UniProtKB/Swiss-Prot annotation:
It is a single-pass membrane protein. Component of the cytochrome b6-f complex, which mediates electron transfer between photosystem II (PSII) and photosystem I (PSI), cyclic electron flow around PSI, and state transitions. PetL is important for photoautotrophic growth as well as for electron transfer efficiency and stability of the cytochrome b6-f complex. One of its GO terms (biological process) is photosynthesis. The chain crosses the membrane at residues 4-26. The lineage of its organism: Eukaryota, Viridiplantae, Streptophyta, Embryophyta, Tracheophyta. SUPFAM superfamilies: PetL subunit of the cytochrome b6f complex (SSF103436). This is Cytochrome b6-f complex subunit 6.
Length: 31
């Protein structure tokens, strides 16, 4: 179970970082 939970947490963190980076690039391009 801990492995699945840690994997899910890692996936969620990666998704958050990717979306944040994408939004940052979009804002930079917008400006």
């Amino acid at each position: 179970m801990p492995t699945i939970t840690s994997y899910f947490g890692f996936l969620l963190a990666a998704l958050t970082v990717t979306s944040a980076l994408f939004i940052g690039l979009s804002k930079i391009r917008l400006i």
